[in-house]
C-alpha cells in the first residue's frame, strides 16, 4: 500500500487486527527487516510496517532528515486515522519515533526504542570515525544525516510521558551513556541492555526481538 504526503509516495504493509503497532526500520533498510516479527504480531495487533522516505519502495528524495521523516510519520498516523499506536523503531526509526513523541505526544500510545541516539556524539567514537571515512568515499544524504543529526536534549525527553521500552546491545555502536541518558530522562521508561548483542543482532533475529518485547506489550494490554 502507499500513502501520499509531501510530494512523496510512502510504502507500508498493513496486516493483522487489534491495537495498532507501527514498525520503523533503520538507515539503509526497509520494512522487511521485521518480516518474521510481523508474523508474530499479526494475530494480536494491526501491524503497519513502513518504508521510510528514500528507502525500500518509498520515493527517492534528497530531502532526507530526521525532521522530515518525523513529519512523514505524523502525517501517516493522522492520514490513516491510527489512534495512538505503539511505535517500535530501530536505530533511525527509533529516533523518528522518539522525536514524534516529543513533538506531537498525542499521536503515540507507547514507544519501543531500539538502538536510539540523541546526537551524533552519542555514537561510540570508533563508529563516528568509521562513518566519516565512509562518507568521504561514498557521500550520501543518508550518511550526512547520521553525521549531523539528530539534536535531542535530555530536557526534551522529559516531555515523553507514555510507556517506553529502551533496548540496546552491550556491544552496540551507541555509547552506553547515551542509552542510559534516554532511559533515565523518560519518566515511564524501562531499560534493557542485552548482553553480547551488537547494534542490530537482536533486531535481525526477529524471534529474539519478539521475546524481548512481549512482556512490555502484555503490560500495555493489562493497563488498557
Please identify what each model-predicted range represents.
Residues 160, 166-168:
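Short beta-strand/loop motif that positions the catalytic acidic residue
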Residues 197-206:
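Catalytic histidine-centered segment of alpha/beta-hydrolase-like enzymes
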Residues 39, 49-86:
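Active-site loop/oxyanion-hole signature of alpha/beta-hydrolase fold enzymes
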Residues 102, 111-137:
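Flexible "cap/lid" loop of the alpha/beta hydrolase fold
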Residues 173-178:
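Conserved alpha/beta-hydrolase "acid-adjacent" motif
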Amino acid at each position: 500500500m502507499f500513502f501520499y504526503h509531501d510530494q512523496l509516495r510512502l510504502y507500508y504493509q498493513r496486516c493483522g487486527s487489534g491495537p495498532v503497532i507501527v514498525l520503523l526500520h533503520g538507515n539503509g533498510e526497509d520494512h522487511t527487516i521485521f518480516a518474521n516479527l510481523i508474523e508474530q504480531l499479526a494475530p494480536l495487533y494491526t501491524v503497519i510496517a513502513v518504508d521510510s522516505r528514500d528507502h525500500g519502495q518509498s520515493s527517492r528524495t534528497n530531502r532526507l532528515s530526521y525532521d522530515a521523516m518525523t513529519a512523514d510519520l505524523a502525517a501517516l498516523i493522522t492520514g490513516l486515522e491510527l489512534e495512538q499506536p505503539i511505535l517500535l523503531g530501530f536505530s533511525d526509526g527509533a529516533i523518528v519515533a522518539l522525536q514524534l513523541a516529543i513533538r506531537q505526544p498525542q499521536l503515540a500510545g507507547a514507544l519501543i526504542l531500539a538502538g536510539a541516539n540523541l546526537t551524533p556524539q552519542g555514537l561510540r567514537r570508533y563508529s563516528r570515525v568509521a562513518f566519516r571515512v565512509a562518507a568521504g568515499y561514498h557521500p550520501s544524504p543518508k550518511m550526512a544525516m547520521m553525521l549531523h543529526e539528530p539534536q535531542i536534549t535530555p530536557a526534551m525527553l522529559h516531555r515523553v510521558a507514555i510507556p517506553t521500552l529502551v533496548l540496546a546491545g552491550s556491544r552496540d555502536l551507541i555509547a552506553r551513556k547515551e542509552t542510559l541518558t534516554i532511559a533515565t530522562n523518560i519518566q515511564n521508561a524501562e531499560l534493557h541492555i542485552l548482553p553480547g548483542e551488537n547494534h542490530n543482532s537482536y533486531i535481525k533475529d526477529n524471534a529474539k526481538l519478539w521475546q524481548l518485547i512481549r512482556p512490555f506489550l502484555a503490560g500495555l494490554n493489562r493497563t488498557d
